[in-house]
Amino acid sequence: MEEQIDILNPDGTPAGYSCGRTRVHAEGLWHRTVHIWVFDGKGRILFQLRSHLKENNPNLLDTSCAGHISAGDTGKNAAIRELREELGLDKSPEDLEYLFEATHENVLNGGSYIDNEYYDTYRTSVTDEEAARLVPQPGEVDDFKWMTVEEFLSMHAKNPEKFVEHPKDYGWLAGL
């Protein structure tokens, strides 16, 4: 069965129903997601290279990890699930630092994929051992790239088309 997602009103309040993610994106229904930024002991940031098979934003660098919050779930639980699925990383709720909420509106693929989301942003850290054991989820993530804040800012300034655009996230990173 397709993942069910709680629907929101445009103001972020619960709409009182859930539906499958295909309908969510076909109709542009507002919903909740999570973004998780992973840092290593050297202060570098993990970016994922989205799979070339992805329907939206294939082959672009993106947040370390992200995903939908399933119906009835919490942001922290979704973040823990996505870290495990996309990176092979096991973390506990105490390992996640909540940063902020933001909204994202985007129309892709000639209007067939509409993404209207409220997202919770988290930060976590990994040891060198954890970083060495990261495993990209087939079909979701093709590779990883570690960058310092300075490297990211330089690369993003020169080649913004290589990144999924997340202005609030990138503004936060620039302030580190």
Which residues does each predicted region cover?
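Short helix/strand-bridging catalytic loops that position acidic/His residues to coordinate divalent metals
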Residues: 21-24, 62-67
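Nudix hydrolase/Nudix homology domain
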Residues: 22, 59, 71, 100-105, ...
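A glycine-rich, hydrophobic loop/mini-helix early in the fold
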Residues: 33-65
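A structural signal for short, well-ordered beta-strand segments
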Residues: 36, 65, 98, 120-122
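Acidic, metal-coordinating catalytic segment for phosphate/diphosphate chemistry
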Residues: 1-35, 39-42
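The catalytic Nudix box helix
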Residues: 47, 64-99
